[in-house]
């Protein structure tokens, strides 16, 4: 048994890279909570932090090099900017740039709004579907802050991280976000409320812009305009079409991995093991199918036989 759980984001990157058809690529991973990483912070305090967003430089046969990583946790602790962290824990030589914050990552902000709208955190697709019913609203505070212009992070006044599972909207702090008292404990569908719809609009537009900024930063770092995207936020198909339009202006090609869920990490692990063993530099073709398992085909004769066996009536 080979345990690769210490490189969760790298497995996402491998899945996307080896299925993209690109010979080399810039990988951008935007995830809820990747590898759990214990860190000894200030005053000797131990904190658990998590992979949030990562940039990789990918080449055959199996060079997937970490360039940048955003780690986050519940805190509180002082944020660290422009840190040089050892890449040894990801089975790499050298170092990479790292930012550590005590706030939610891009995906966790989306999950917080998903919970606020009355859904389970894993049902972010429903928030994506609610987004077009909302509109810009000045009563909603910015979901991200620019930290003095040096880097952008989640606005902790709005989103309270509860790692490793989900996050929460600090709704009582902001008048517009509060749930009406007559609705709080009795409403069956929170999505009928204006504040839910408008916050769904805000989180979709703001998070997809954050990811676009990250992609452009990643391309600037690598100089490679072949981009692969994965991690939980990669399942946001509304955002993916937004990137296609925007990246086309910069001559950037995008492959958004359809298996961006954690199911893709198992595929990525298999790809890494295969290339480490074979050292093959053969560029794999673009993956044009999601159906990777065994195929099953039935004809009318077989179905009829099963119907006879169980005394069923076959209707065409």
Q: Model segments located where?
A:
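Short acidic/glycine-rich loops and adjacent helix/strand connectors
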Residues: 1-316
């Amino acid at each position: 048994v080979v345990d690769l759980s210490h490189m969760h984001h790298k497995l996402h990157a491998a899945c996307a890279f080896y299925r993209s058809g690109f010979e080399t690529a810039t990988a951008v991973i935007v995830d809820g909570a990747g590898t759990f990483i214990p860190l000894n912070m200030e005053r000797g305090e131990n904190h658990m932090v998590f992979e949030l967003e990562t940039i990789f430089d990918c080449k055959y046969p199996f060079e997937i090099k970490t360039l940048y990583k955003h780690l986050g946790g519940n805190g509180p602790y002082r944020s660290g900017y422009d840190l040089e962290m050892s890449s040894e824990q990801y089975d790499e030589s050298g170092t990479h740039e790292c930012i550590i914050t005590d706030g939610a990552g891009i995906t966790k902000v989306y999950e917080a709004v998903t919970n606020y709208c009355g859904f389970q955190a894993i049902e972010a697709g429903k928030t994506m579907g609610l987004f077009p019913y909302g509109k810009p609203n000045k009563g909603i505070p910015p979901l991200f802050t620019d930290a003095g212009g040096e880097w952008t992070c989640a606005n902790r006044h709005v989103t309270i991280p509860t790692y490793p599972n989900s996050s929460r909207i600090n709704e009582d702090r902001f008048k517009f976000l509060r749930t009406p008292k007559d609705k709080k404990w009795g409403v069956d569908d929170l999505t009928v409320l204006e504040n839910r719809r408008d916050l769904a609009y805000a989180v979709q537009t703001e998070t997809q812009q954050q990811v676009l900024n990250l992609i452009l930063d990643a391309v600037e770092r690598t100089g490679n305009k072949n981009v692969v995207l994965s991690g939980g936020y990669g399942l946001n198909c509304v955002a993916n079409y937004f990137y296609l339009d925007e990246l086309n202006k910069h001559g950037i090609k995008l492959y958004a991995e359809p298996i961006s869920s954690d199911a893709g990490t198992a595929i990525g692990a298999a790809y890494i093991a295969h290339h480490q063993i074979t050292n093959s530099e053969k560029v794999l073709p673009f993956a044009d199918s999601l159906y990777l398992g065994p195929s099953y085909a039935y004809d009318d004769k077989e179905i009829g036989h099963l119907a006879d066996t169980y005394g069923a009536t076959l209707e065409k």
